[in-house]
């Protein structure tokens, strides 16, 4: 029996989502709080887990071609990780990360 892990999809994080992650790290002060670092690490792990189950999370109500992870605890700390699945290429592209309390996004916000 092989212990190799099969990865079905490659997860790519867009430049926009990388900036979102960096800003979020600063916003929650993860450099100075162990709890914030654990929360942030959990968010990043949820993104990595998309390589195995990209269709687990629901489609967004803004655009049916997009999906989102809802990460955190309600009501104050839920973040949305907006992504799309490029099925033919077996790629999950993370496009944007935003606080769940923010207004709906426009697809033009994802650039």
Task: List where the protein language model places each region.
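Residue-level recognition of specific faces of alpha-helices
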Residues: 20, 27, 46-49, 68, ...
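A short, surface-exposed loop/turn module that caps and links secondary-structure elements
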Residues: 45-75
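Arg/Lys-rich, positively charged N-terminal/basic patches that mediate binding to nucleic acids
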Residues: 1-42
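Enriched for short, Lys/Arg-rich terminal
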Residues: 2-4, 71-111
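A general secondary-structure boundary signal
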Residues: 9, 20, 68-71, 84
């Amino acid at each position: 029996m092989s212990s190799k892990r099969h990865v079905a999809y490659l997860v790519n994080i867009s430049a926009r989502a990388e900036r979102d992650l960096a800003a979020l790290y600063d916003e929650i002060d993860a450099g100075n709080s162990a709890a914030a670092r654990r929360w942030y690490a959990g968010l990043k792990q949820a993104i990595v887990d998309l390589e195995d189950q990209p269709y687990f999370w629901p489609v967004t109500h803004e655009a049916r071609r997009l999906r989102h992870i809802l990460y955190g605890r309600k009501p104050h700390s839920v973040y949305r990780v907006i992504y799309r699945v490029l099925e033919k290429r077996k790629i999950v592209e993370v496009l944007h990360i935003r606080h769940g309390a923010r207004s709906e996004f426009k697809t033009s916000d994802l650039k």
